């Protein structure tokens, strides 16, 4: 999980979601693309 000031989708499988007030990116194809804003 990468923590970044700005999260962007890295590939076509990345989805931007909101969990507990935090913006996150989850990726079904590549788990390395997981990101959290903060």
Swiss-Prot record:
MF terms in GO: structural constituent of ribosome
Keyword Ribosomal protein attributed: yes
Swiss-Prot/TrEMBL keywords: Ribonucleoprotein, Ribosomal protein
Domain of life: Bacteria
Signal peptide as annotated in the record: none
Biological processes annotated in GO: translation
Pfam families: Ribosomal_L36
Keyword Ribosomal protein among UniProt keywords: yes
UniProt xrefs under InterPro entries: Ribosomal_bL36, Ribosomal_bL36_sp
One cellular component (GO) term of this entry: ribosome
PANTHER family: 50S RIBOSOMAL PROTEIN L36, CHLOROPLASTIC, LARGE RIBOSOMAL SUBUNIT PROTEIN BL36C
Family in the record: Belongs to the bacterial ribosomal protein bL36 family.
Name this polypeptide is given: Large ribosomal subunit protein bL36
This protein's encoding gene: rpmJ
């Amino acid at each position: 999980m990468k923590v970044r000031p700005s999260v962007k989708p890295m590939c076509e499988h990345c989805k931007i979601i909101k969990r507990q007030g935090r913006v996150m990116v989850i990726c079904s194809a590549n788990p390395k693309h997981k990101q959290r804003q903060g």
